[in-house]
Amino acid sequence: EMGKLLYMTDFEYCKYNFQAMRLNHLVIECNYCKELVDKTAENYTHRLKGHCSLDTCKILVKTNHTAALRTVTLVHLSNEAADPEQILKEIKEAVVWDDALVQIARPGLEVNLDLCPF
């Protein structure tokens, strides 16, 4: 059994709180770091309105974090406006339970979604 998984991508903000569900796995977009977004880019408004920032991702992780959380997999990072090392560091800081695995999705990544890892 894998438990409960929340998958969220292509959103600016999420007004819902899933903490009562005691999620086990988060697969969540972390598309850009605000300071890296090119304000003159043609897709500037779309990036802000149609994608999740690092700041929003951190809030969502903190808001929905419980001791049941086992994995946080970050997806849909921008090639131009994301710093994977910064994102990983800041999301790891948002996850207060040390045993939750935080990682960035890459081609070929396999994530163990078993509820019990043993």
Segments and roles (model prediction):
Residues 105-115:
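A short, charged, Gly/Pro-tolerant segment at domain boundaries
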Residues 19-107:
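Cap/insert and terminal regions of metallo-dependent hydrolase folds
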